[in-house]
Amino acid sequence: MAAAGRERQMSEAGADAPVGSRLTDTVAAYSTRALAGGTTIAALFVLLVAGAIFPDSIAGTLADVLTSRNTLASALRLSVPIAFAALGGIFAEKSGVINIGLEGLLIISAFTAIYVTDLTGGIWIGFVGGVLASTLLAGLFAIVTIEFRADQIIAGLAVWLIALGLAPFASQVIYNGPNTPTVPTPDAISVPVLAELPFFGALFSASPSVYLLFLSVALSWYVFERTAFGRWIRASGENPKALDTAGVSVRGVRYAAVLLSGVLAGMGGSAFSLDLGQFTGNGPTMVNGKGFIAIVAYLFGNYNPVGAFLSTLLFAGLDAIQTVLQLRGIGIPRQLIRITPFVVVIVVLALVGRTQTPEAAGDHYESGEE
């Protein structure tokens, strides 16, 4: 009864929102993304047909790469840190807190996971250590932005810069260099028979982190669509006054969402370094912009966990294709692939006008504010 009353109060308090305008924006956003997806599928179909007809042409080579099991396996592996960070970004931003410090959370968790694994000898202990480090840094970000009402963009950049300096420095102090020694990597999980399939077999013979990602995407979707907590997060980002009127703490919901973003980003960073067995801290570190691509992914996915995952898989797939083509002697500049996600989102934003950004994202809120 209490929960139902809260839902009614939230609906009544938010009745003045421009529903028609928001609905129009939503339809436009999804229509454009559907058009982009349909165009991509059609282009892939044409390429595969051309490759089958002319196997010795560049189309044939591309078709061979696209249907390669190794390409799918590589795309899944590359998508892990980006997709986990994207899920974390969705939770934070849907609650009204813009967390652009995802890059920093990936960096700190990637280093800590390797360090704890090297210290204890336990891969999963290291994984948990990386998640805890990311969550602590996210907690610091939450205190600064929610409690002290700091600018969220500046605070997010500070998180990135802190991690960018701290992780290589710690590696230098502990290991006398920006790169850590190698540690054991987790064994792949293989499903008998299914793992032998020509292309989709890569789905059934992968690192545990890939299956953990699948589970996290499904659970994130369920939380947003089927739970009261998910509705509270959406209300906190769309109409915090309605949530406050219903008797739910906006501050508490935002703290929980930001900490959850730290957990998810930490899972991505830990899995990334542990799957490779090493942390490299040269330059922008091994993370190298994946946290920023995660932001692009959830924007392109319109703040939907499944959409963000599919966007991530698309971007990671382009990177995987580029890698395979390089191995086959067809050079495509890596920098060109790296800017593709950002170009795609700019095009989508130009066509749609804007993504369905939460109304109160970036705004501070105190209980009782008018």
PLM region spans:
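Helix-loop-helix hairpins and the membrane-proximal interhelical loops
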Residues: 33-81, 87-91, 280, 366
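Short loop segments and helix-boundary regions at transmembrane helix junctions
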Residues: 27, 93-98, 137-193, 286-289, ...
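Single transmembrane alpha-helix segments in multi-pass membrane proteins
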Residues: 69-127, 131-132, 137-153, 299-303
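Transmembrane alpha-helical segments in multi-pass inner-membrane proteins
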Residues: 279-342
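Cytosolic-side transmembrane-helix boundaries in multi-pass membrane proteins
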Residues: 1-50, 220, 246-252, 325-370
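Helix-loop-helix "hairpin" substructures at the membrane interface of multi-pass membrane proteins
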Residues: 78, 205-280, 305
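Transmembrane helix-bundle core of multi-pass membrane transporters
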Residues: 164-224, 333, 367-370
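Inter-helical junctions in multi-pass inner-membrane proteins, predominant
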Residues: 65, 70, 224, 257-296, ...
